Each structure stands twice: as C-alpha cells, then as structure tokens.
Amino acid sequence: MRRKTVLDFAKGRGPYVWITAYDYPTAKAVDEAGVDGILVGDSLGMVLLGLPNTLGVTMEDMVRHTEAVARAKPRALVVADMPFMSYETGPEDALKNAARLIRAGADAVKLEGGAEYAHIVERLVKAGIPVMGHIGLTPQRVLTIGGFRMVGKTEEQRRKVLEDAKALRDAGAFSIVLEFVPASLAREVTQAVDIPTICIGSGPHCDGQILVLHDVIGLSERPPSFAKRYADVAAAIREAVSKYAEEVRKGLFPAREHYRE
C-alpha cells in the first residue's frame, strides 16, 4: 500500500485518525493499526522526558525522534512538531528548522499559533514544506494563558479562533488541529474552512481526531479529561517486570533454554 501524502487529506474524505508516536516501535505499531497520520509531537517532553510542559523540548529532540519514527517507514503521513522558539524568531529561522525536520523524515510540520504566524506558514509552504496549523489551546503558550485551559468560552476568544483558522487556511496550511475548544466552536470552524480540521478535546464535529498515544494505552500519569484509555500498558509492564524479578530472585531465570554453555 502506498504512503499517504498531504493530498490524501481533503475535506469530506474523513474522519481521519491521527495519533502521536515518538520512536521506531511505536510508529510501527500504530501504523500497522491503520492510522492515517502520525504526529511526532513535542508532547514527548511530557510523556517521555517527564517535563511539566513542552517548553523544554529542543530541535535536537524533535529531529532525533522524527528520524526514529521515519525509520519505521510508515504508510501514514508523518508530521513533526516545530518546538518552542524554533519559528517565533522569524521566517528564515522557521524555514531552516522546518527543513531539518523534513530532512529527518517528516512529510510536513506543525506549528502552534494563528493569524500572527500566518506569514511563517506562507513562507514554509512557498518553500515546499507542507504545514499543519494548531489553534485553540496552544501548549507552547502555557505561561501566558495560565495553564492548560479550554479556549473559546468567550465571544472574543471564539472570534479569534475562527479568524485564526481562516488566516491559516489562506496562508496555505493543509490542515488545522483544534485543541480543547467547545464542540460548537469546532463545528463552526470546520464549516468555515475548506481544509480538514483535526480535533483533540474539541468534540465530534471535526474532520478527524488526534490523541496522545500514551493517553490511549494507559502510560500517562495524568491524562487530560478529554482522552480515553483503551488499554493499561502500564499495568502490563508492571506485571511482566514483577514476574521477571521474581524468577531472577528464585533462580528460575535464566532457564536452560536461555543460554549456552
């Protein structure tokens, strides 16, 4: 089966299934499960590195993990997050950093922010780099927005989210992530733009959904309220390692079939 490209993500062809992955084995597993898109998210800072937010994630982190995901040769589209301060300093810095992620194996990049970064999106798209937008709750702005809170409760916020979506569309983004906005606002945005919207914590009215893998499989310590756990991998790990430890301490492992004289 051929690999997906951004041209496969068109309005009306969904719902599209997206999930995060950060390394070779998880990328291989989620791709075999049949997802449409894989996001190498800067959320790796929180779910892999134990950071309190995504601000400490570097370009080096993103390049390394994008390379690992790309080695799985997924059929799904691979999008890599542009981390904090990798594009805010201007179009040329953004272009250089986005190019690093494309060379690492990403098919596109994602950046947070709306109309204020439309010129960045336009510069990347003109250079041949597909861009996914990200509006609503933008975790890289956590220090200025007062935490991980729903966006779009006031009329001013709703108007801003809608304007941001249209600005990103006009700048050439191929898709937009809507994070933690009211479902009614997500529906309004989805109806207002002719590119796919991908919801996370924003209800059922988008063109697709995305979740963090570790929330889905039960490896997150504090998953958000909008996530659903489909497995308890943490419990499976504890059980397996406990059995291993018990067998080592009882002299049952390694057994004869596990070594050579």
From Swiss-Prot:
CDD domains: KPHMT-like. It is found in: Cytoplasm. Its EC number is 2.1.2.11. GO terms for cellular component: cytoplasm. Mg(2+) binds at residues 42, 81, 112. It is an enzyme of class 2 (transferase). Gene3D superfamilies: Phosphoenolpyruvate-binding domains. Binds 1 Mg(2+) ion per subunit. Its cofactor is Mg(2+). The active site is at 179 (proton acceptor). One of its GO terms (biological process) is pantothenate biosynthetic process. The keyword Magnesium applies. Pathway: Cofactor biosynthesis; coenzyme A biosynthesis. It catalyses: 3-methyl-2-oxobutanoate + (6R)-5,10-methylene-5,6,7,8-tetrahydrofolate + H2O = 2-dehydropantoate + (6S)-5,6,7,8-tetrahydrofolate. One of its GO terms (molecular function) is 3-methyl-2-oxobutanoate hydroxymethyltransferase activity. Keywords: Coenzyme A biosynthesis, Cytoplasm, Magnesium, Metal-binding, Transferase. The keyword Zinc does not apply. SUPFAM superfamilies: Phosphoenolpyruvate/pyruvate domain. 3-methyl-2-oxobutanoate binds at residues 42-43, 81, 110. Belongs to the PanB family. Catalyzes the reversible reaction in which hydroxymethyl group from 5,10-methylenetetrahydrofolate is transferred onto alpha-ketoisovalerate to form ketopantoate. Homodecamer; pentamer of dimers. HAMAP family: PanB. This is 3-methyl-2-oxobutanoate hydroxymethyltransferase. It comes from Pyrobaculum islandicum (strain DSM 4184 / JCM 9189 / GEO3).
